[in-house]
A protein has these predicted regions:
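Active-site bordering "gate/hinge" segments
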Residues: 1-293, 312-315, 397, 435-442
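Dual-mode signal for accessory low-complexity, basic/Gly-rich regions
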Residues: 270-442
Length: 442
């Protein structure tokens, strides 16, 4: 652990432990999360193969947030950076100026045993500390592979990062651990994109799969064709399927929405175990996935990492709650993933592969992206979306692209016996095969 970052966190904790005061109000308890480190990036400039690479760039940064409880019962939230200990008086005045009253404000948690999970890859740390040649090598490999198939327009970006995270509080919590990340984004002809993002480097197999998928899928999406219309089987790729689940299920599991009545689900629904999916489907949260972005031993509030199952065998079990809404809803606080996957959609039956599903579709679509998912009414479960580059499947083969609109109820899809989880070669979450209404778009 770098001495500079350790000293920064310890100095800040020392100042807060001294019970500083503003206008007669003292800080009586506190917690903060602080992080800092290096990021290296490179890319293909202007999105054109054969042109100059975007020069590798290095950036160093630090930041975080603090939560204070004052002697007069008020609370404050504030931001942190590397200057916070030196400018402590001014920062404290800012935090006090933003103080507010909240009868349900969360208490500071005492330290608890933290689970072990790998959050850093030494191979990534070595690249950040040394030469970023691997970032260029990934881009060159992508350039050569796609150029072989005549693709002339590509956007690509690669990055690696190493950092340190400190979660301290006034009750003695002193969690400090390293983090790393590695990512590669590749898009071709403004038609199709794939990415890799974990806390570790990609394997040669993972990198090869990404390149081959982009090389194989992009040409198909370059051929305009007529889409199937009406009620159609539509295969949602994993990233898009996760977007639907996040929008219509995870958003409605949020404790704040449940408590205030803005969710499709009520507290009573959780108490009685309302069925919201088929019995063979479950949704879990897991922060103990080694070297995934989700990996995290402790949240910013001091909640230990772990596993939780908000939906088990299709039935509501517990909302997703922070400390405040854990108290209000009378459910235990939820472990907080450090990144993706934010949740895991699971089925009880073995999954067919995407290739198997496509080969058996006489008429259907595969979707990689849609427009407007974030703007849908999550509480209703209903959607009306446009897919500008829908992959048309006819006779078990991908035959081109079409622009379509699709509409339906995602709640109904998750109860439909025809809905199917589908295994893809990448990611921890599956794709989804749903039956939905498809109409043409000009």
């Amino acid at each position: 652990m770098p001495e500079v970052e350790v000293e920064l966190a310890e100095r800040l904790a020392e100042r807060l432990d001294a019970r500083p005061s503003i206008g007669g109000a003292e800080v009586v308890s506190w917690r903060f999360v602080l992080g800092g480190g290096w990021t290296l990036r490179a890319g293909l400039k202007a999105g054109r193969l054969g042109g100059p690479y975007e020069a590798p760039a290095a950036a160093r940064g630090s930041g975080g947030g603090v939560y204070l409880r004052w002697s007069d019962g008020q609370c404050s939230h504030g931001s942190l950076d590397s200057r916070s200990p030196d400018d402590f008086g001014d920062r404290l005045a800012e935090w006090r100026a933003n103080a507010y009253s909240d009868p349900d404000a969360p208490e500071i948690l005492p330290p608890a045993p933290l689970p072990k999970v790998r959050t850093a890859d030494p191979a990534v740390e070595a690249i950040v500390d040394g030469e970023p040649t691997l970032l260029i090598a990934w881009l060159e490999q992508a350039r050569l592979r796609l150029a072989r198939d005549g693709m002339a327009r590509v956007d690509a970006a690669s990055s690696v990062a190493r950092s340190w995270r400190f979660v301290f509080n006034s009750h003695g919590l002193r969690a400090a651990y390293p983090e790393t990340s590695a990512s590669l984004y590749l898009a071709a002809e403004e038609l199709y994109a794939r990415s890799f993002a974990k806390r570790r480097l990609p394997t040669e197999s993972e990198l090869g799969d990404l390149l081959e998928d982009v090389a194989a899928t992009t040409p198909v999406l370059g051929w305009p064709t007529t889409p199937p219309l009406g009620e159609v089987p539509v295969l949602l790729a994993p990233g898009l399927a996760a977007g639907f689940v996040a929008t219509f299920i995870v958003a409605n599991l949020n404790g704040a929405g449940v408590y205030t009545g803005r969710s499709a689900f009520s507290l009573e629904d959780f108490r009685r175990g309302r069925q919201v999916m088929r019995e063979d489907l479950s949704l879990a949260i897991d922060t103990l996935l080694d070297l995934e972005r989700a990996a995290s031993p402790v949240s910013a509030e001091g909640v230990p990492g772990g596993r939780a199952t908000p939906v088990q065998a299709g039935r509501l079990v517990r909302p997703i709650v922070d400390l405040k809404y854990a108290r209000r809803c009378a459910f235990p606080p939820t472990p907080v993933p450090g990144g993706s996957p934010a949740f895991l959609l699971r089925g009880a039956e073995p999954l067919r592969s995407a290739e198997q599903v496509r080969s058996q579709l006489q008429r259907g679509l595969q979707l990689h992206s849609v427009l407007g998912l974030h703007a849908q009414d999550a509480a209703s479960g209903r959607y009306s979306l446009v897919a500008p580059h829908a992959q048309v499947i006819r006779g078990g083969r991908s035959v081109g692209r079409a622009k379509v609109s699709l509409s339906g109820s995602f709640f109904e899809h998750l109860l439909d016996p025809r809905t199917e989880l589908v295994a893809f070669p990448w990611g921890l979450n599956p794709g989804l095969l749903i039956w939905t209404t498809v109409e043409p778009q000009a």
